[in-house]
């Protein structure tokens, strides 16, 4: 009896693995689950991309508006998305579209921006003229200083805007399509003037109404923040559709810049989210 009991326990211990039939059943179940889950992965990634982008855009706009109410003006030291040559940075994906153009500020534009609190911007640079031996990044450190988060960056790079400052302009068609803004509230026949700056980590919003500037989360390898400028753009109006300068620039909204097809707003991404199957 004792020998039989010991032998029985020995048999149970030896049979710790699965039989061939059990393995086949498990593999069939795993294959079936993979057939269900794998087709959903691209959709899940795009949903994560669209929902994150929409949330970040809305939160950025809230932070800008809160800053304006607290400090009676819009933030300084936003990223100027043109290079020293006056052209749109090559790594600004939306700059490849017809939505954006290089635009030189007029006296009226400068006055409107200054009256709204925007007096200084941070120029960004191409990689070839950027840091040497430092950590240049199209998103996290697109400036000409020699190290990431350099303590002297603002003192060195913060540049007053003037009539010689080239910035990124936004077409009336793009603003109307994405932000629902029509010049003079009637038509797009006479376009208003819109300019755009990037919301980087060094803006005067940091530590006040914003802990860190949001970064675009993309669903493709070409839209990652190590490839393109992954911050969000803030659009301001400086003149109305009749060419009359605004007394102070008006904040229009926040847009995503990581798509070569053009700018997009929160609603655009939410629409994509709900159209996915």
Locate each region found by the language model:
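N-terminal leader/signal peptides at the extreme start of proteins
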Residues: 1-16
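N-terminal single-pass transmembrane signal-anchor helix
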Residues: 15-45
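Intrinsically disordered, low-structural-confidence terminal and linker regions
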Residues: 17-20, 60, 92
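A generic secondary-structure signal for well-formed alpha-helical elements
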Residues: 40, 64, 68-75
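Aliphatic-rich helix starts adjacent to a transmembrane/signal segment
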Residues: 40-61
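Short, glycine/small-hydrophobic-rich surface segments
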Residues: 70-112
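Long, compositionally biased eukaryotic signaling regions
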Residues: 109-114, 122, 126-127, 134, ...
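Short, surface-exposed interaction loops/tails
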Residues: 127-277
């Amino acid at each position: 009896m004792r020998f039989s009991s010991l032998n029985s326990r020995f048999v149970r211990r030896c049979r710790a693995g699965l039989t061939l039939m059990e393995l086949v059943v498990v593999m069939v179940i795993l294959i079936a689950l993979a057939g269900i889950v794998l087709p959903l992965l691209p959709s899940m990634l795009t949903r994560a991309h669209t929902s994150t982008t929409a949330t970040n855009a809305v939160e950025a706009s809230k932070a800008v508006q809160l800053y304006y109410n607290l400090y009676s003006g819009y933030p300084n030291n936003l990223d100027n998305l043109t290079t020293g040559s006056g052209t749109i940075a090559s790594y600004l994906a939306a700059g490849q579209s017809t939505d954006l153009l290089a635009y030189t500020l007029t006296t009226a534009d400068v006055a409107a921006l200054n009256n709204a609190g925007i007096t200084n911007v941070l120029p960004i640079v191409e990689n070839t003229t950027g840091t040497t031996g430092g950590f240049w990044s199209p998103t996290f450190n697109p400036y000409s200083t020699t190290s990431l988060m350099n303590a002297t960056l603002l003192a060195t790079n913060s540049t007053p805007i003037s009539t010689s400052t080239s910035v990124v302009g936004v077409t009336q068609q793009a603003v109307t399509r994405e932000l629902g803004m029509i010049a003079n509230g009637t038509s797009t026949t006479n376009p208003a003037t819109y300019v755009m700056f990037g919301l980087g980590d060094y803006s005067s919003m940091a530590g006040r109404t914003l802990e860190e500037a949001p970064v675009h989360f993309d669903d493709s390898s070409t839209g990652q923040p190590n490839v393109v400028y992954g911050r969000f753009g803030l659009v301001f109006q400086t003149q109305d559709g009749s060419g009359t300068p605004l007394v102070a620039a008006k904040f229009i909204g926040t847009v995503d810049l990581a798509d070569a097809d053009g700018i997009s707003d929160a609603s655009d991404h939410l629409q994509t989210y709900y159209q996915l199957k």
